[in-house]
UniProtKB/Swiss-Prot annotation:
Species of the source: Clostridium tetani (strain Massachusetts / E88)
The keyword Oxidoreductase is assigned to this record: no
Family: Belongs to the class-I aminoacyl-tRNA synthetase family.
Extent of motif 'HIGH' region: 120-130
Subunit structure as annotated in this protein's UniProt entry: Monomer.
Name under which the protein is recorded: Arginine--tRNA ligase
GO molecular function terms noted in the UniProt entry: arginine-tRNA ligase activity; ATP binding
Disulphide bridges, residue numbers: none
Subcellular location: Cytoplasm
Catalytic activity: tRNA(Arg) + L-arginine + ATP = L-arginyl-tRNA(Arg) + AMP + diphosphate
PROSITE patterns per UniProt: AA_TRNA_LIGASE_I (PS00178)
């Protein structure tokens, strides 16, 4: 039984409003003593020509109270107190019946969603900043898929641009082939940094780089061969990191893929009378939208990012006919995407409204900053390995007898990093702290994973439960608060979709872990006062583990069975 639906149906028969409209108005009161659900009567005042508190009183008298402990009116609110044993039975049985599917729905059935994320630059380090986009995009993919959407995971590789001319010039002068074979990205970064250092002393190098890029654009064999080599070596390295993170993609079509699709876009913009000349460049004027012009071609005739992103969006609409296209790219690109989407609208592509840029903040280390040109960069692979090593140290200190220590350290260490990136609103910067991130107390990945492992330990000791379970035995405050928290899983997922904010699911699973540990600390489970209470509590533990597992899976984090 879904109490929200039940309340909506019964109210609908009294006030003749559509069930779905009523359901949207139902709230969860801030305090348990105010009930489990509340219906505000403000919106009915106009229709009924009465004060909201009078409407609430009349509704209370007419409402069918079966399956409810009580229904009260408090000022303009109608407050509902559910029958705790019916509620607990419904929630726990639903979780244990649906298992890995609990929280899922058909919300997105028949709808195509594209999610572009990660998108690192070829021949440059996959650094800690890239994990923001990767973690958010991967979580959104899992969340959308869980709710029935047909999703495509797109990795828009930065595999084109003038930097490749510089890299080819650097390669021909300074590459160490042995080092390139061993650690490709580090060697490519070394020669790229060297190019910039040397170019400061000898500006002719910049011209050499431009020449190589021109030859690459013209399809000259040597340059194309080297560019392909850089791309393949980089992808191999990126895939190592993706494997560590359990992240996959459906497409790696990057900037180079859209190179031959831009002329048609420039032509279309011109045909629609949108292309004007400004300081020698070809632009689309956007002053009516309080934005600077969208540059389509620079004064030297070269196209830029905006042209490529316009071509990309048009190609994706033709190829996938998406319902929603999401770009997970840093906040600093906000204006760029506003310009691109506005230009698409001016071109007559109304589906531009279905394109959304979701930004994210920066990653800050108390003692280190990120910069590619000078080579001072924290490689993500190194950071993940360091997290796993530090976790292994903690395990050896706390439980050296644990089986599969290395595998467990990997799940906890990598999970802790992902959890940190997804814990707060995505637009907030992250200040990185090892002590905080790897703590088994507080709002961390290890705390949630430990809560799951604690639950699984109880279930291993209890064995299989035989016979019917009497859920009316779950009558402590902590038990009911935990059941209510478990019931809210689907709501948190749908909110995450609406706001494109995975942290809503992260915050939710923290609340589940907190409610579970509160229940665990206040109630004896394996040594409960009688067998019926024990059975009901074990089922509550089992359903809690299932919800934690489902939620962590949506965030791209694995559970740990033993700690």
């Amino acid at each position: 039984m879904n109490y929200k639906e039940l309340i909506s149906e019964r109210l609908s028969s009294i006030i003749e409003l559509p069930i779905e409209d009523i359901e949207k108005l139902i709230e969860i009161p801030p305090k348990p003593e105010m009930g489990d659900f509340a219906f505000p009567c403000f919106q009915l005042a106009k229709t009924f020509r009465k004060a909201p508190n009078m409407i609430a009183e009349e509704l209370k008298d007419k409402f069918d109270k079966s399956n409810f402990e009580k229904v009260e009116n408090l000022g303009p609110y109608l407050n509902f107190f559910v029958d705790k044993s019916i509620f607990s039975k419904n929630v726990i049985e639903k979780i244990l019946e649906e298992k890995d599917k609990y929280g899922a729905s058909n919300e997105g059935k028949g709808r195509k969603a594209l999610i572009e994320y990660s998108s690192p630059n070829i021949a440059k380090p996959f650094h800690v900043g890239h994990l923001f986009s990767t973690a958010i995009g991967n979580a959104l993919y899992k969340i959308f898929t869980f709710e029935g959407y047909d999703c495509e995971r797109l990795n828009h590789l930065g595999d084109w641009g003038t930097q490749f001319g510089k890299l080819i010039a650097a390669y021909k002068r300074w590459v160490d082939e042995e080092a390139l074979e061993k650690e490709p990205i580090k060697e490519l970064l070394r020669i790229y940094v060297k190019f910039h250092d040397e170019a400061e002393k000898d500006p002719a190098l910049e011209e050499e780089g431009r020449l190589h890029f021109k030859r690459l654009e013209d399809g000259e064999e040597e340059e194309v061969k080297l560019w392909k080599k850089f791309r393949e070596l980089s992808l191999k390295e990126f895939e190592k990191v993706y494997h560590m993170l359990n992240v996959e993609f459906d497409s790696y079509a990057g900037e180079s893929f859209y190179g031959d699709k831009m002329d048609a876009v420039v032509e279309e913009i011109d045909e629609k009378g949108l292309l004007v000349e400004s300081n020698g460049a070809k632009v689309v004027m956007l002053e009516d939208y309080n934005m600077p012009p969208c540059i389509i071609k620079k004064s030297d005739g070269a196209t830029i990012y905006a042209t490529r992103d316009l071509a990309t969006a048009i190609y994706r609409k033709k190829t996938y006919d998406f319902y929603k296209s999401i770009y997970v790219v840093g906040l600093e690109q906000s204006l760029h995407f506003k310009q691109v989407f506005t230009t698409l609208k001016l071109m007559g592509h109304d589906w531009a409204d279905d394109c959304t840029h979701i930004g994210f903040g920066l990653v800050r280390f108390t003692d280190r900053k990120l910069s590619t040109r000078k080579g001072e960069v924290i490689f993500l692979e190194d950071l993940l390995k360091e997290s796993v090593d530090k976790t292994l140290e903690i395990i050896n200190e706390k439980n050296s007898e644990l089986e599969n220590k290395e595998e467990t350290a990997k799940k906890i260490g990598i999970g802790a990093v992902i959890f940190t990136y997804l814990k707060n609103n995505r637009e907030r910067d992250i200040v990185f702290s090892w002590d905080e991130m790897l703590s088994f107390d507080g709002e961390t990945g290890p705390y949630v994973q430990y809560s799951y492992a604690r639950g699984k330990s109880i279930l291993r000791k209890s064995g299989e439960i035989q016979g019917d379970v009497d859920y009316s035995k779950l009558n402590s405050k902590e038990e009911f608060e935990l059941v209510k928290t478990l019931e809210g899983f689907n709501k948190s997922i749908l909110q995450a979709i609406e706001k494109l904010e995975p942290s809503i699911v992260t915050r939710y699973v923290i609340e589940v872990a907190k409610a579970f540990n509160k229940f665990y600390n206040h109630n004896s489970i394996l040594n409960a006062e009688d067998e019926e209470i024990k059975k009901a509590r074990i089922k509550l533990v089992e359903s809690t583990c299932q919800v934690i597992k489902n939620a962590l899976n949506l965030l791209g984090i694995e559970v740990v069975e033993k700690m």
